[in-house]
Amino acid sequence: MLRLTVNRNLKGGCMNKKQKKMLIRILITIVLLVALNLLHIKGVINLGLYLVTYVIIGYDILKKAGIGILNRRVFDDNFLMVVATIGAFALAIYEKSADYNEAIAVMLFYQIGELFQSYAVRRSRKNISELMDIRPDYANLLEDGQISRVSPDEVAIGSVIVVQPGEKVPLDGVIIEGNSSLNTSALTGESLPRDVKEGDEIISGCININGVLKVSTTKEFGESTVSKILELVENSGTRKSKSEKFISKFAMVYTPFVCYSALALALIPPLVRMFFLNLSPDFDVWVYRALTFLVISCPCALVISVPLSFFAGIGGASKEGILVKGSNFLETLSQTKIVAFDKTGTLTKGVFEVSAVHHSEMENARLIEYAALAECASSHPISKSLKMAYGKEIDRSRVTDIEEISGEGVLAKVDGSDVAVGNGKLMERLNIPYHECHLSGTIVHMAIAGEYSGHIVISDVVKPNAKTAIDELKKAGVRKTIMLTGDRKKAAEQVAELLNVDEVYSELLPADKVSKVEELLSGKSDREKLAFVGDGINDAPVLTRADIGIAMGAMGSDAAIEAADVVLMDDNPMQIAKAIKISKKCLGIVYQNIVFALVIKFGCLFLGAIGVANMWFAIFADVGVMVIAVLNAIRALRVKDL
């Protein structure tokens, strides 16, 4: 069986020591087999040399079969191979044919197949092992002006570490000195560097490209982003899909069944011929068919290729910055027909910006300038948006007599003129007639020197590729898209219409979102799965309640990594459709392998039972099918162009 573990020391696709030893054994066996066929040695010496060759190529299989028998786990592929090959030896001795080639060939090609699948698994692990390379080996701890290299586990919260160019960021923290560019590709799949400067948060696992950074740590290594991600990936193999569980249960029933069937094939027809038909029993013919039947029946194509397909799919997704917590979630994701979004941070940037300016006799730039100056003392998000739109340093000497009226706005003198900045209530308080605005967003009205000057529209900005992301979801097979938001109905409906979202539910509190998701779950069929996409902030209850929770833009968000089933490391909504496409490709490959292996196996079993298929045919039906299935499985790694 395939063990879905991660080898952190894996480098590239080279063979490991065990694989090299197996290759040497295979080559020695081939040389000996060719020599024995050319030399035509006879008698006991010939048998002895073939047995030596058999032990060289098959001693590990013999050992595993013996351990299985001692542990009362008899029926596995090792047992099948041992019975088939020893039976072939016994049959050759009984017939005095001295042709032991088939017995050796069965074990030889089985081992070639095992080596191939081992190498394929190693190659498929490459993507996840590259992700494992984000684990930092050390941290440069700065104490009393001296830098010492220590294990990241030894660094306490609040310590200062130095990250040199080319080094991995070992712990999460805040930059207190320096600026640089970070390579985040191992985390997000994004090839473009991310620029950082003093005051920016920085997460572990990124690679510092050029500048020297001093970082004040905010988390211990065990709680850092890199540790959370590594734990997530390493545990992904423990969560089995229904397909994998089916194959495991199938193998437990199938292998004993074919063993007893082979025994029946070896005994019943000869006995029927002898006692009921008065014919020669031909035990050698039926035993040969039974041995062929056993070789064909080996289920390794299924038990290897199915988990390998999921492993490759998870590995390919991780390379694109999509972390799937297990093959069960990959399978559920492939069945997603309804996608519900939390609007803020997923479809929109979650950052308020000035989206429109409507003025009376004052130009746009001056209206924004007066608004920003009047709001200079406020820390409200609306004030920040106005100051950002102004884009210049605030000259506070131009502003006096600032008065903030809670829930309404701000009064101030700017350059000696009375300025009022706020909502409709503030205009009504000052008895200043104002114009209603029908655009979605927050409307900031302005009056200067007692006269209405216009209004500024501030809204949450829709991500540039959000509409394309919705379209891609439809192409990926999603039947319905839904937007859940706490925004006002009018603003929510305008965003939904802009993005072509099918349904929108607005003015929802966090608890209301959970109730709405439960309502949506009860209204769908069991075969359809509902995915909820959030940014991980206050979304944990909904992420866990949906059939599958997807956290987007989760770099540095512990809550998202903990609560979600699928974690998208950047905030690109296009990744949602990509994740679904990857899951569909992976499941398609799984079903292809299951159908292909079963059809070929049962067809060849029938041919073996009636005597059409010989041992060489059986070798192809076993090893050939496994090789084809494994080659198909590793296609799940290729996901970049989806």
What are the language-model segments listed below?
Residues 354-480, 489, 501-517, 525:
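P-type ATPase nucleotide-binding
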